Amino acid sequence: SGIQIAVFERSAYDLWLTENLKKAELIRVNSIEESHNLFKENKVNILAGLKPKLIEEMKKNNNYEMIQSPFTYIKQSIGIKKGSPEVLDFINKFISNNIKEGYIKSLLKQHNVQDKLSIPKIN
């Protein structure tokens, strides 16, 4: 089809596009920055990426636009074997304590993504 999409290799959206997109060529690169550079240099037609970074690009160049509906949602999770209540309890306490103690919030601030990602509320 002649359509080329820049994508950060091994990202969640790379996996999704690989499984679901059949009529375009994925151009895989080693960093998010490299994928954005390919797009800015007109070496690809489309840039796949996370919405906050795409919004940053749109603010810098009013010739860019973004589809409004995301094509996938990234939901992170942890898997354990059934019948391991002590492991489930450990993971739940670990996550809950790190949220309550502010560690997760401090990591978001450290990486300057506190306005881009959210933390679930813990009772």
Describe the predicted segments one by one.
Residues L17, F39, V44, I78, ...:
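Residue-level signal for nonpolar/aromatic packing positions in well-ordered secondary structure
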Residues E19-N20, I32-A48, P52, K60-N61:
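Short helices/loops that flank or line small-molecule/ion binding pockets
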Residues S1-S11:
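Short loop->beta-strand "edge-of-pocket" segments that line small-molecule binding or catalytic clefts
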Residues K51, I55-H111, Q114-N123:
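Periplasmic-binding protein-like
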Residues R10-E19:
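Aromatic-rich, solvent-exposed beta-strand/loop patch
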Residues E9-S11, N30-I32, A48-I55, E101:
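Beta->alpha turn/N-cap motifs
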Residues A12, I27-L38, I74:
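Short helix-initiation/N-cap motifs at beta->coil->alpha
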